[in-house]
Curated annotation (Swiss-Prot):
The keyword Transport does not apply. The keyword Oxidoreductase applies. Fe cation binds at residues 178, 180, 235. This is 1-aminocyclopropane-1-carboxylate oxidase 3. It comes from Cucumis melo.
Length: 320
């Protein structure tokens, strides 16, 4: 039986349908780790500009560079499966705590302006979604934003990716399977070329391309904070022989020095319920993740538990 990917209409949060929509979001967080938002409040005109300028920037500044990389690595003539490279062309924009847009020389002023406007809208949407999760979890409004804050506010950035046509998609992934390390991810994906797959009950399920939607997925930090009630989920991008797929993924993550641990309200007061996840500084987790991104998340959590035990012997981690 084909599973329907969860699609949430945010217009229905206003009025009598609110409880039903919150239940849909809760079910998606518990059973999928992903859901797709429509009527999310970001203007279609702005999204169309972002898409147009992103595709123009790829053609002008990134396409030739990607072809040269493919040629230098011989990726267009591989005969066996490649497991250490992704078929993607990317660059990264940092928005918070400090923007790096002025440092990226090949972005024209119009593109910078539009991406700044888009990032501002996504930041607001991320915080709105986090508060919906708080409401479902029985946490006070603003709890997740506060935990993410650290001393300088959250980390927020955007990975802009293009997945060009691939001559041998059966031998190389657009992006290998992984869970995301951070907090809340907001994806504006191509509405014509598919390729994003989510692992659901042991099967890969396609995330349907929808015009003007934003796909939400949960990172490892939300799994920790919810003590496993919500899950980060493995996902991948399949390379395609036809079509150039655009993907703009924005990551609303904890600040580097934010201390991450299961919310006490989700652990205390429940008989036989124990704290399943460790307490750690987000930056320490990221340092570990860099080398283990394309592996299962459980060994990362175990490594952080071991680090927590060592820290307990040396003294407690301060909670901001």
């Amino acid at each position: 039986m084909e599973m329907d990917f969860p699609v949430i209409n945010m217009n229905n949060l206003n009025g009598e349908s609110r409880v039903s929509v919150l239940n849909q979001i809760n079910d998606a967080c518990e059973n999928w780790g992903f859901f797709e938002l429509v009527n999310h409040g970001i203007s279609h005109e702005l999204m169309d500009k972002v898409e147009k300028l992103t595709k123009e920037h790829y053609r002008k500044c990134m396409e030739q560079r990607f072809k040269e990389m493919v040629a230098s690595k011989g990726l267009d003539s591989v005969e066996t499966e490649i497991n250490d490279t992704d078929w993607e062309s990317t660059f990264f924009l940092r928005h918070l705590p400090v923007s790096n847009m002025s440092e990226i020389g090949d972005l024209d002023e119009e593109y910078k302006k539009v991406m700044k406007e888009f990032a501002d809208e996504l930041e607001k949407l991320a915080e709105e979604v986090l508060d919906l999760l708080c409401e479902n979890l029985g946490l006070e409004k603003g709890y997740l934003k506060k935990v993410f804050y650290g001393s300088k506010g959250p980390n927020f950035g955007t990975k802009v990716s293009n997945y060009p046509p691939c001559p041998k998609p059966e031998l190389i992934k657009g992006l290998r399977a992984h869970t995301d390390a951070g907090g809340l991810i907001l994806l504006f994906q191509d509405d014509k070329v598919s390729g994003l797959h989510v692992l659901k009950d042991g099967k890969w399920v396609d995330v349907p391309p929808m015009h003007h939607s934003i796909v939400i997925n949960l990172g490892d930090q939300l799994e920790v904070i919810t003590n496993g009630k919500y899950k980060s989920v493995m996902h991948r991008v399949i390379a395609q022989e036809d079509g150039n797929r655009m993907s703009i993924a924005s990551f609303y993550n904890p600040g580097n020095d934010a201390v991450i641990y299961p919310a006490p309200a989700l652990v205390e007061g429940e008989q036989e319920k124990t704290k399943l996840y460790p307490k750690f500084v987000f930056d320490d987790y990221m340092k570990l993740y860099v080398g283990l991104k394309f592996q299962a998340k459980e060994p990362r959590f175990e490594a952080m538990k071991a680090m927590e035990s060592t820290n307990l012997n040396m003294g407690p981690i301060a909670t901001v």
